[in-house]
Amino acid sequence: MKRITIIAALAGAGILAGGAALYFSSGTQEGAPRRALWLPAEAPTKPAWTARVTPLAGDGGNGVVDGALAASRFSDPFGVALDLQGNVYVADGGDSNRIRRVKPDGVVSTFAGGREGFADGVGAAAAFHTPSALALDRAGNLYVADTGNHAIRKVAPSGSVTTLAGDGQPGYQDGVGRAARFNGPVGLAVDRDGNVFVADTYNDRIRRIAPDGTVTTVAGNGQPGNADAPALAAGFDTPTAIAVDKKGTLFVADTGNDAVRRIEADGTVTTIARPLENDPQPILRRPSGLALTGDGYLYVASGAGGRIVQIAPDGALHALLDVDRPPEASYGSDGTVRLYAPRGIAVRRDGSLVVADTQALRLFSLAEPKKGEAAPPSQSPVIRHSASMPWPVGPQQEVHEVVGVMGEVRGSYDGESRHHFHAGLDIRADIGSRVLAVLPSKISDPFPNWGFGSLGEGMSLGPFSYIHMRVGREANGKALDERFQLLLDARAKPERVRVRRGARFAVGDALGTINPMAHVHMDYYPGGAVVNPLTLPFVGLRDTIPPTIQGIALYDAAGKRIRPARKGQPLRIERAQGDVNIVVDAYDQMDGNLARRRLGLYKLGYQVLHADGRPVAGFEAPLITQVYDRLPREREAVKLVYADSSGITVYGSKTTRFAYAVSNTMQGGQALPGSWKVGNLAPGDYILRIHAADFAGLVATEGRDLPVTVE
């Protein structure tokens, strides 16, 4: 094993820039000769550049598999660091609890750790608990924010792991080495003098570990807050990443405040970036990773929303663009890079980035596209869960009523009837009953829950989000157990719940209690993208009821409805109209549903037949236009696949109407406009047959045919 030790740097840059540099590699054994190595200059950073996102390591499945890049697996890839030989070090939490290494030759291996625990040692003899951020010093030592152990660990080039500070217990205490205490530290950085700066996440403070091991507090008053002020008077809310420049200025990803903060050498804290108020889709949301370039650019991983934000030295802020997702119409991509849950970022010498995505369970490379280079696959494979799945409410081994499925249109509380797609599965439960974990999982997101006291309150755990519950609280408001920390306001009233990264939950553990929505909503995102939860084999779930078609309507290209036919007569369409839009009013039900229940469909399309039932050429089988296995990430796409007569304006007992714009397409999570090309048909009588199917494969047979005459 070899590492590089810096002995010279041009222009005094903390990250080399501006010219070539001479380094020496350290030998694998004491006394071994060192080899001189010239490195090329760090490339100057391009403002607002366009990237190609390419999978670097991991296949999207959860596990611990070393070996070739594409076959490797991670459990919770979080922090990343690059050494001067091009090795990528990865802090892999979850059930892995390892420091992994990705070599330039394309092989993933384990560098240190291998079990959950708190133990020093060499290689696999060492133990970590949910390692998070990584940082390398100038001597090649790797520092680890060992979140679940409330400690900072040091890995020597030989693979020997020692504890730099912290004693394995949560708390707040300055001191030397193990006499100091942290509370779930997630972020860290090392300056050129060997000082280690720590984002002491759940203490809401920034700490410093001097080269002699002395721990002191740099900034933060110890309470979640949002205050620019000198040093210990400043307020942070769950800081999770930190970076330091060559002048000693610190930059902090202040996750709970959706902000990036700066700490000057004198301790003064200011805010350099945060979203505009009332911005419904900010590019900077829940920042959780930082990386500095040698020429002063700062990259920020927006943990919610998935964007990679570049902040220039002059303060200009841009989301990196994605060459393979150019801006589309109002219903499509905005053109920016959209990962799933980006965390750690590292900058290569050529200016490209390595990003760890905990939700996608992969490492990605972001680089300028090369001429003639093919675009990578746009989707991760869906890893099927084959074992029987318990329900998220009790009794977990008995069937419960499904009251909402993926892909349904949903309205907003302020009157918009087509506000967003329903992204998961709704399971009815009594208000106050407990929501239960369905898979053994650890908390990955440092800020995993949201919406305290609101109807949309929820928490992410493993590949799921559990929503519409009082997170971590009984119906009477008391905390369920010590994994949930109630934070109090100035009147000693609970104002939020804090759940640490690394908290572990077994199947059946209580996560919260049902709020007045009277159901729990589950989003499911194995490998990153939201997937239909009906792919999970829930115990006893049955569907023997085919969908119901309530009506079929046609609209011209201007959106005007074509006059319905008189009873017993075909609907007449002028061939000159060319493009016609098809809207189908339909719904589904499952076994056990109340009579009033309306569920959305899984697959829709249409077929054109001659009057005698023979398929028109090109329509030998139904043309499938919409499949609700994945959903677009752009919220406005809901207005493309649902007609404006869809939805409801408020939640509650009102019936939702699903008016599908069947001539528009929704495939593979991408929505595109379309139409029925009646201009391609010869004049005559036809049958427009709607294909409406549910996830079980049952197809509507009644009300599916609309006789038409093309004139």
Where are the regions a protein language model picked out?
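Gly/Pro-rich loop segments of beta-rich domains
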Residues: E42-F78, V107-S132, S160-G184, T214-T238, ...
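Residue-level detector of Asp-centered blade-edge/turn motifs that repeat once per structural unit
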Residues: L82-Q85, L136-A139, V190-D193, V244-K247, ...
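Conserved beta-propeller blade signature
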Residues: N87-Y89, N141-Y143, N195-F197, T249-F251, ...
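Short loop/turn segments immediately following the C-termini of beta-strands
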Residues: G93-G94, T147-G148, T201-Y202, T255-G256, ...
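A short loop-to-beta-strand structural motif that recurs across blades of beta-propeller domains
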Residues: N97-R101, V107, H150-K154, S160, ...
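Blade-level signature of beta-propeller repeat domains, shared across WD40, Kelch, NHL, RCC1
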Residues: L339-P377
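Surface-exposed, glycine-biased beta-strand/turn segments
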Residues: K370-S465, G472-G477, P494, R498-A510, ...
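Long, low-complexity serine/threonine/glycine- and acidic-rich segments characteristic of extracellular
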Residues: R500, A506, R542, A557-V710
